[in-house]
Amino acid sequence: MDKKTRLSASDVKLIRKETTHQGYFRIDRYNMRHRQFVGAMGPEISREIFERGHAASVLMYDPDMDLLVFIEQFRPGAYAALSSPWFKQDGSPWLIEIVAGIIEDDEDPGDVVRREAVEEAGCTVDELELISHYLVTPGGSSESMFSYCGRVDASDVGG
């Protein structure tokens, strides 16, 4: 394959897709083949993909007080990670995070972070600037994240 040729979605052949688990989250199994860098199609592979939708997050900043606003939440995944020797945090499933929320169908990501900022931190976002839109863990999930920086007044925020 020519070094200047870029591979794209048209270089993937979906053979089968099936839902293997449907609960709070969904897991789909994809059987597919994809073009390799040498130009030929590779063998069939099977991969499970964690489907949880898409999310939006906001790093809240108060420029008048020169403060960042974070929240603390219990996370089941962090609890499960406590059994791993690779999880070297403080041993707590309560994490310090930026505000985030799941994007519902036909919902604007900016509206999600404005709503979540009020619900989770009691902050109204005055200005919002998109930092990036990216895939969170593309090796095993289709989830994408819209990350913003938002101007807030943190003078009434507790914690």
Q: Language-model segments: which ranges?
A:
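Conserved active-site beta-strand-loop modules that form the wall/rim of enzyme catalytic pockets
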Residues: 67, 127-128, 144-146
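Active-site-adjacent beta-strand/loop module that shapes the phosphate/pyrophosphate-binding cleft
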Residues: 23, 32-37, 137-158
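Alpha-helical and coiled-coil interaction segments, frequently adjacent to or embedded
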Residues: 1-16, 21-24
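Alpha-helical hinge/cap motifs
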Residues: 107, 119-122
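Acidic, metal-coordinating catalytic segment for phosphate/diphosphate chemistry
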Residues: 22-65, 73, 77-83
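Short, solvent-exposed loop/turn elements at beta->coil junctions and helix N-caps
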Residues: 17-20, 133-137
